């Protein structure tokens, strides 16, 4: 499996708790890169988008979807967490992300992002019942949905995800709750999810693998580690590679 990165914005740090990051934007690069890939005759099995800094970048991803219509289209609609938009994102990102999600095969919002896409009141903590209901409604936007960061599973002892498919059965995946919150775990989850699907796993099995790996990353990270700096991803990679 070979990944081709298409940078949308360069940030000196992420936007959570590290002050105001320096931002590098090159709006001409993305369209030029896509045109170059097309001239080369490249074929992509999947197009997966994450953090997008402004609505024009959502349009760039839509352009990629149109150029490679047979690719699996996965969108992590990075908008916010903890009941609010991420710092640096304007309210105009919500309709832009909604439109992008409507062109995807699979979307992976957290409970806050699910509420933003649906126009629901922003949640503090997402219950499993609320997440299941939101996931089902989100299948009107995209045919496959996974809502992450769902608490309240097993009387609060677990955290997990709720999945739904248009016209299909819903499901939930849970892992033991470790009471620590690290930045970047959503990106790790999405990367493993997409990788497992491309290896031929059905979405529920891919979600299970991704959730288990994130849990392992947190377990491998010593308590007291600055949560803003993320998990010790490398320590958990051998177990993922053995699966």
Name each model-derived stretch.
Residues 204-243:
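Charged C-terminal helix
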Residues 170-183:
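Short pre-catalytic strand/loop immediately N-terminal to key active-site residues, enriched for Gly-Thr
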Residues 88-170, 201-204:
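Conserved phosphate/ATP/ADP-binding segment of small-molecule kinases
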Residues 115-116, 180-203, 207:
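Short, small-residue alpha-helix embedded
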Residues 15-16, 56, 120, 157, ...:
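Short Asp/Glu-rich motifs
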Residues 9-11, 53, 79-81, 113, ...:
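Glycine-rich beta-alpha junction loops
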Residues 1-87, 236-242:
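Conserved N-terminal subdomain of the carbohydrate kinase-like
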